[in-house]
Amino acid sequence: MNVLSCSINTLIKEGLYEISGVEVGQHFYWQIGGFQVHAQVLITSWVVIAILLGSAVLVVRNPQTIPTDGQNFFEFVLEFIRDVSQTQIGEEYGPWVPFIGTLFLFIFVSNWSGALLPWKIIQLPQGELAAPTNDINTTVALALLTSVAYFYAGLSKKGLGYFSKYIQPTPILLPINILEDFTKPLSLSFRLFGNILADELVVVVLVSLVPLVVPIPVMFLGLFTSGIQALIFATLAAAYIGESMEGHH
């Protein structure tokens, strides 16, 4: 009996050890200062940032009295972000327009890059490149930035009185109110990660099973949903900031 229980315990420990070592996909890492850095995310994120900065510099470096098509497009995007920020935050939306705009544009271009840029052509020693938002590290980082932003907004507006919201309308709700602030970044990150990952997986499966023409409608649908996900993330981030400044749920 002792031998049998020892064998069972050994199998369980080995099984749990193997499960704990499982990774989703293959990853390419850099060693920087003793830290293991996920290189795929950094490379694609730098490409997205370069696209955003490069397009902005090309359009606004020589503004025309009669706006060009590029100027009109950027002005439209700016007005759109202002409207979203004002609707969700209120009268004090001005300082938060750059933050909300950066979130929206980075997520939007990242999502679209997964469908429009030929990442698969670039060969890595391990793994392959994909949209930055296809990785949970990116979406969690964006969600944590949002959390820091709405805590900062509430504290800068109300000081330490901001924390009184956790015992409103009754102190009994203190654990639930605290839990709510932890679930906000989780819901933001997993919603974005899940949608982008699922979209890319569906396209990959369809391309491998059927001719290229058939998955095209699904790819267009993916572009549409990618834009919607960027809008949802930016809108919720602005809503959380507005909520922390106003103090209502």
Curated annotation (Swiss-Prot):
**The entry's keywords:** ATP synthesis, CF(0), Chloroplast, Hydrogen ion transport, Ion transport, Membrane, Plastid, Thylakoid, Transmembrane, Transmembrane helix, Transport
Q: Which domain of life is it from?
A: Eukaryota
Q: Name one GO cellular component term.
A: proton-transporting ATP synthase complex
Which residues are listed as membrane-spanning?
A: 40-60, 97-117, 136-156, 201-221, 222-242
Q: Name one GO molecular function term.
A: proton-transporting ATP synthase activity, rotational mechanism
Q: What InterPro entries does the database record attribute to this sequence? A: ATP_syn_F0_a_bact/chloroplast, ATP_synth_F0_asu, ATP_synth_F0_asu_AS, F0_ATP_A_sf
Keyword Transport recorded: yes
Gene3D superfamilies for this protein: ATP synthase, F0 complex, subunit A (1.20.120.220)
> Which Pfam families does the record match to this protein?
ATP-synt_A
Intracellular or extracellular location(s): Plastid, Chloroplast thylakoid membrane
Topology in membrane: Multi-pass membrane protein
Instruction: State the function annotated in the UniProt record.
Output: Key component of the proton channel; it plays a direct role in the translocation of protons across the membrane.
Q: Quaternary structure? A: F-type ATPases have 2 components, CF(1) - the catalytic core - and CF(0) - the membrane proton channel. CF(1) has five subunits: alpha(3), beta(3), gamma(1), delta(1), epsilon(1). CF(0) has four main subunits: a, b, b' and c.
Q: Which family, according to the similarity comment? A: Belongs to the ATPase A chain family.
HAMAP family noted in UniProt? ATP_synth_a_bact
Write down what this protein is called. ATP synthase subunit a, chloroplastic
